[in-house]
UniProtKB/Swiss-Prot annotation:
CDD domains, A to Z: AdoMet_MTases
Binding site for [4Fe-4S] cluster: C91, C97, C100, C179
Keyword 4Fe-4S included in the entry's annotation: yes
Protein name from the UniProt record: 23S rRNA (uracil(1939)-C(5))-methyltransferase RlmD
GO molecular function: 4 iron, 4 sulfur cluster binding; iron ion binding; RNA binding; rRNA (uridine-C5-)-methyltransferase activity
Keyword set includes Metal-binding: yes
Biological function: Catalyzes the formation of 5-methyl-uridine at position 1939 (m5U1939) in 23S rRNA.
GO term, biological process aspect, one: rRNA base methylation
The organism's place on the tree of life at top rank: Bacteria
Catalysed transformations (reactions): uridine(1939) in 23S rRNA + S-adenosyl-L-methionine = 5-methyluridine(1939) in 23S rRNA + S-adenosyl-L-homocysteine + H(+)
Active site: C407 (nucleophile)
Protein family per UniProt: Belongs to the class I-like SAM-binding methyltransferase superfamily. RNA M5U methyltransferase family. RlmD subfamily.
Length: 451
């Protein structure tokens, strides 16, 4: 195998060697436009630069994070000529912390960027424009996140405990004591968490910390070795001060220190309460989650005699509100433990017309007993991979209306191609601003069978 000299990448014999740009190098650039993920795009000497923290039309100094072939990833270090659109970020750690990527962009422009990303994916991949664009669903720009994972790492060489969030494009930890996107109930906990953990007698036993806010506030500590009694007492005093439950995650499943403690969240418009456990999926933005459910019910508008299917149902986030409108809801999820908790949630909310089933949603739906009667309406809320295997079978269920909630416009567009081929029409679509200050796009799309 040929040796690789530092800074050079060699092509096979007879090819052309390409000079690679080392990480850390600074370069002055003119930003031409924004990419789909909110980074600025610049072109220089045959290479395309993706520059975090920049805006179209700006002159910036960028520091290289990574370079591969003709693509360079970088972050803004200095702005020589600022866009009139630029605003001061709300967070002092912006640009270093990897959590937020577009705090320098006004919120209305963030929404426009996300709308454009969705529209471009649908047009480019599926060659379709919805009959109607819905207004973006959004809530507060800041103080919206009710769940967060805080990275913790003991640096034995430096004898230092790092507590914070992962850096942008890196596994490094940015030490953080304040995060403006966390809900208010978690702010004082986050402010004092690093100082408390640094008093541990055995910091090398610390893994990570998760913070939760809902019906109750909770702190979960992942630990890789048994905790010293003094350290456990420190944790308990900290949680008591902040009125938070304490959960520990050593070997096995996470458990509350007080056996009676439980976690849950409210869906106030329907007077529902859903229980959940660490490891379960819940939407981190409570306000947008509620607005999303309200919009889904309005778009689907199931009649009282209809049978509705909810696929990738999780804990019943959509299924339980739907049960208040339809004759019957059949909800299907791949994770067995979440199916069990969803069924308990239905019973605890006195809902008896919703059934939950565990199934591999990559397999034919029509082979299952619960699918035998068919459905007039289907709701999908798949993971980022989308629901291609499911949508290939949707027409066999008899569904006239299908609501697709997506956390990835690329797979939504791909699945739209299949739905159109089956005779469905894209009636309405819009973005869900579940993660303000980031370029992450969630969307809702309504399909109806063409007449």
């Amino acid at each position: 195998m040929a040796k690789h000299e530092r800074g050079l990448r060699f092509q096979p014999a007879g090819g052309v060697k390409t000079v690679q740009i080392p990480a850390g190098k600074k370069q002055r650039l003119t930003i031409e436009r924004l990419s789909d993920d909110g980074r600025g795009i610049a072109f220089l000497e045959g290479k395309t630069w993706f520059v975090a923290g920049s805006l179209a039309g700006e002159e910036v100094e960028a520091r290289v994070l990574n370079a591969r072939g003709k693509v360079v990833e970088a972050r803004t270090e200095r702005v020589f000529t600022a866009s009139t659109m630029r605003r001061a970020p709300a967070c002092e750690y912006f640009g270093r912390c990897g959590g937020c990527s577009v705090q320098h962009v006004p919120h209305e422009e963030q929404l426009a960027l996300k709308q454009r990303m969705l529209a471009e994916q649908l047009l480019r991949v599926a060659n379709v424009v919805p009959d109607e664009w819905a207004a973006p669903l959004s809530g507060a720009e800041l103080a919206y996140r009710r769940r967060a994972r805080v990275a913790v790492r003991w640096d034995a060489k430096a004898k230092r405990l790092d507590v914070g969030f992962r850096a942008a494009a890196s596994q490094d930890i940015v030490s953080i004591e304040h995060c403006p996107v966390l809900v208010q109930a978690l702010q004082p906990i986050m402010n004092e968490l690093p100082g408390m953990l640094k008093n541990f007698s055995k910091p090398q036993a610390l893994g990570h910390v998760e913070l939760f806010s809902g019906v109750a506030t909770a702190v979960l500590l992942r630990h890789t070795a048994p905790l010293a009694e003094a350290d456990l007492a420190l944790l308990q005093a900290f949680c008591s001060k902040h009125g938070a439950q304490l959960w520990l995650h050593g070997e096995g499943e996470p458990q509350p220190v007080s056996p009676g403690d439980t976690l849950g969240y409210r869906l106030e418009p329907w007077n529902l309460q859903l229980a959940w456990r660490p490891g379960d999926f819940i939407q981190v933005n409570a306000a947008v989650n509620t607005a999303m459910i309200e919009q889904a019910l309005q778009w689907l508008a199931p009649a009282k005699d209809e049978r509705v299917m909810d696929l990738f149902c999780g804990l019943g986030n959509f299924a339980l509100p739907l049960a208040g409108l339809a004759r019957e809801v059949v909800a299907v999820e791949g994770v067995a433990t979440m199916v069990e908790r969803a069924a308990v949630n239905a019973m605890s909310n006195d809902l008896h017309n919703v059934q939950f089933f565990q199934a591999d949603l990559s397999q034919p739906l029509t082979h299952a007993d619960w699918a035998a009667e068919g459905f007039s309406t289907v709701l999908l809320d798949p993971p980022r991979d989308g629901a291609f295997e499911v949508v290939r079978q949707i027409r066999k269920t008899g569904a006239r209306r299908l609501l697709y909630v997506s956390c990835n416009p690329a797979t939504l567009a791909r699945d739209t191609v299949e739905l159109i081929s089956q005779g469905y029409r894209l009636k309405r679509a819009g973005i869900l601003d579940m993660f303000p200050q980031t370029a992450h796009v969630e969307a809702m799309a309504l399909f109806e069978m063409s007449k």
